[in-house]
């Protein structure tokens, strides 16, 4: 637990140094209006939450990395996420905003962390930070052992390696 806390602090410090805006966690409820890919959704906040906005917020799920859309299993990851949350009421726990203006945080469907679900079902990897296997390492280990989703093939290529070899999807 102590190790994870130190590594989380290092991750937040890296975000500050890299130009990411970090603020206190903001929570809001809303409806998922669009799925960009296996780890990015658009959520329209509820007016009743006092935000005074109904413009959808682009949310990049933290703690995981889903395959690129043009990568093997990329379409399946996006489809699984859409089936799970599209047009559903969710809670966003926004931690920061990245340099592209995307909110960074977690998505909750009731009491379920959607990121944990994606990794457990084999639709994404637990995001690694240096030596830290990430917050969903246990879910990834079990998905690998069961051969779920992208782990049904030996040694699936990490998205960062795929991007390095092929560039971004068009």
Describe the predicted segments one by one.
Residues 7-19:
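Bacterial N-terminal signal peptides
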Residues 22-129:
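Electropositive
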Residues 130-170:
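N-terminal targeting pre-sequences for secretion and organelle import
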